[in-house]
Structures are given as structure tokens and as C-alpha cells.
Amino acid sequence: MSDKTVKSTNLMAFVATKMLERQEDLDTCTEMQVEKMKTSTKARLRTESSFAPRTWEDAIKDEILRRSVDTSSLNKWPELKQELENVSDALKADSLWLPMKSLSLYSKVSNQEPSSIPIGEMKHQILTRLKLICSRLEKLDLNLSKAVLGIQNSEDLILIIYNRDVCKNTILMIKSLCNSLI
């Protein structure tokens, strides 16, 4: 009977040893996965930061925002001005003139007149781009949430939590902007 007890104890010790070895393998595997996620997240953050929003000054320096005046619109301007003044006189509202004037003088990045771009199409393009930005931010937030799992350094953890908060707030702002455009 004592022989069976020794065998069962040895068997239990063997199983426990194997379980511990397996757990160590899993821990090593998990650590490797976390390290891979960290490096891929850092790479993504570097990629995302290369596309960081630029200031208006930078855009002007790069001549992205150019003022261009189409000569055909200048030729039509006296006629449009007269029509707008007639409408303004008819409605007794001079306030119509200023927004229309500023709208017609506003230049587009695409060098097109505002009147030549349909409002619905422009809204659709803006909404599409905002939704794309939002989806990329959601992917970044997901990757940051995965990276949090294996962080042992408190500074990295604080940085990731801060970046997740920034992502979430930006996503909320973009969604709010999309809703206001709809």
C-alpha cells in the first residue's frame, strides 16, 4: 500500500512539474507576444506621428493653401453683385451680401470655385475622410489597449493610458463633428 502512495506522489509531483514547465513556456510566450505588440505599437506610433497634423503656417509655407482667382468669375462678378443687391433690396436685408461675397472670394485648395463643387459631394468627401480618420484612431486605441496588458514599467503604462485617453477624446470629437455635418 505504501508503494502505491509513493507512485501516486511521484506521479503527482511529475504532473505538477510538467504543469509548471508548461506555465513557464506560456509565460515566455506571452512575454514574447507582449514584446511584439510593444514593438509594433511603437512602429505604428512612429508611422502615425509622421502624418501628424500640420499648422496653418506650415501649410502656407508649403503652398498647399493658395489663393487663386479665376478670371471668368471676376468677369461675372458685376452681374452677380447686381443680382445679390436686387435680392438684398427686395428682402431689405443687407446681411445677405457679406456672406455671399466672402463665399465667392474664398479660394479652394483644389483651385475650383466653391460654386463648382456640389455641397452634397463636398460633405460626403469630408465625412468619408473623417470616418477614415476615426477608424484609424479606433485601431490605434485597440492596439494601445493590447499593449497595456504586458507593460511592467509604470512610465510606459502612464504614457499609454494618456495616449488612449487622447485617442478616445479625439474619436468623440470627430464623431460629434460628423453628426453635425449630417
Curated annotation (Swiss-Prot):
GO terms for cellular component: host cell nucleus; virion component. A motif (Nuclear export signal) lies at residues 96-105, 122-132. GO terms for biological process: exit of virus from host cell nucleus through nuclear pore. Transmembrane segments: none annotated. Keywords: Host nucleus, Host-virus interaction, Transport, Virion. It is found in: Virion; Host nucleus. Mediates the nuclear export of encapsidated genomic RNAs (ribonucleoproteins, RNPs). Acts as an adapter between viral RNPs complexes and the nuclear export machinery of the cell. Possesses no intrinsic RNA-binding activity, but includes a C-terminal M1-binding domain. This domain is believed to allow recognition of RNPs bound to the protein M1. Belongs to the influenza viruses NEP family. Interacts with protein M1. May interact with host nucleoporin RAB/HRB and exportin XPO1/CRM1. This is Nuclear export protein. It comes from Influenza C virus (strain C/Yamagata/1964).
